[in-house]
Regions:
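Repeated loop/turn-to-beta-strand initiation elements of outer-membrane beta-barrel proteins
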Residues: 43, 75-80, 111-114, 146-150, ...
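Membrane-embedded beta-strand positions of outer-membrane beta-barrel proteins
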Residues: 47-49, 80-82, 116, 152-154, ...
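Residues on the lipid-exposed face of transmembrane beta-strands in outer-membrane beta-barrel proteins
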Residues: 47-51, 65-71, 102-106, 136-140, ...
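Transmembrane beta-strands of outer-membrane beta-barrel pores
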Residues: 51-55, 73, 84-88, 120-124, ...
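Solvent-exposed loop/turn segments connecting transmembrane beta-strands
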Residues: 53-61, 89-95, 122-130, 164-168, ...
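Outer-membrane beta-barrel proteins
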Residues: 71-75, 108-110, 139-144, 160-162, ...
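Outer-membrane beta-barrel transmembrane domain signature
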Residues: 147-215, 219
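Predominantly the C-terminal beta-signal and adjacent terminal strand-loop region
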Residues: 201-252
Length: 252
C-alpha cells in the first residue's frame, strides 16, 4: 500500500525527465477512463495475457500481453502502461512488438482537463527499430458514466522514428483521440477508442474491445486493433495492420 501511495509522487517528480527522454505508442489507443472525479478507489490496474500454440504439420505460437496502472488524486490521474506481442511459425519469428508509456491528466473543471503522454515503441518487423512520441493538450469529458462515458482530446506533439534500415526522422505532429465506454451490464463493458497522429506520414489507430468479468479479479477481453499508416516504411509497405486478441485479464 505504501508503494501505491508513493509511486504517483515519484511520477510527478520524474515527469519532466520521462517526457524528454522517451515518449504514447501510436499504434495503440489509451482507453482507460482516467477521470479522477469518477474514480472509485485511489489505484486501479489490470494485466491481460493470451497464448496460442500449434504443433504437428505446422508449428506456430503467438503471445500477447498488456497492462495498465492508474493512480488517482483529487484532480489528477497518473497512468503507466505496456504491451508486448510476438508470433513465430516453424521456429522463425514473424512479428515482435513492444511498447511502454506514461500519461498524466489534470482536471481544471468537472469536464475540462489537460493531459500529457509519452511512450517508446519498437516494431522491427513493421520497419520501426524505435518510435518515440510525446503529446500534450486539452480534453473534454462529455459523458462520465456510470453507463456511458465519452471523452475527446487533442493537442500538438513530436515524434522521433528510427527505421530498421538505419534512417531517422523527427517531425512535429497533431494529435486527436476519442474514447467511448458503455457499461452494458454489471459484468460486461464495451469500449471503442480512436486516435490520429497527423504528420507527413499520418497514423490512425482503432481499438474495439469487449470485457467480460468472470469474478471480482478475473475477466476475459476480446479486442480488435487496426493501425493505418499513410506512408509506411519501405521495409513494411502495407498501409494497414489488423490484430484480433482474446486474453485472460486480472484486476489489481
Amino acid at each position: 500500500m505504501k508503494l501505491l501511495k508513493t509511486v504517483p509522487a515519484a511520477l510527478m517528480l520524474a515527469g519532466g525527465v520521462f517526457a524528454a527522454m522517451s515518449a504514447t505508442a501510436d499504434d495503440s489507443v489509451f482507453t482507460v477512463m482516467d477521470d479522477p472525479t469518477a474514480a472509485k478507489k485511489p489505484f486501479e490496474g489490470n494485466l491481460n495475457a493470451g497464448y496460442l500454440a500449434q504443433s504437428g504439420n505446422t508449428k506456430s505460437s503467438s503471445l500477447t500481453a498488456d497492462s495498465t496502472l492508474t493512480w488517482y488524486g483529487n484532480t489528477t490521474a497518473w497512468s503507466l502502461w505496456g504491451n508486448a506481442s510476438n508470433t513465430s511459425a516453424n521456429d522463425e519469428r514473424s512479428s515482435e512488438k513492444y511498447a511502454v508509456g506514461g500519461r498524466s491528466r489534470y482536471n481544471m473543471t468537472d469536464y475540462d482537463y489537460l493531459f500529457g503522454q509519452a511512450s517508446w515503441l519498437t516494431d522491427r518487423y513493421n520497419g520501426y527499430r524505435q518510435r518515440d512520441v510525446f503529446t500534450a493538450g486539452y480534453g473534454r469529458q462529455f459523458l462520465n458514466g456510470p453507463v456511458h462515458s465519452f471523452r475527446f482530446e487533442f493537442g500538438p506533439g513530436v515524434r522521433y522514428d528510427k527505421f530498421t534500415d538505419g534512417d531517422t526522422k523527427t517531425q512535429p505532429l497533431g494529435y486527436a483521440s476519442g474514447t467511448y465506454a458503455w457499461q452494458m451490464t454489471d459484468n460486461t463493458k464495451f469500449t471503442q477508442g480512436v486516435s490520429v497522429f497527423g504528420a507527413e506520414d499520418t497514423t490512425l489507430n482503432s481499438e474495439t474491445a469487449l470485457n467480460v468479468d468472470i469474478n471480482e479479479h478475473f475477466g476475459l477481453k476480446v479486442a480488435y486493433n487496426v493501425t493505418w499508416n499513410s506512408s509506411p516504411p519501405e521495409t513494411a509497405p502495407d498501409h494497414t495492420d489488423r490484430r484480433t486478441t482474446v486474453s485472460l485479464g486480472y484486476k489489481m
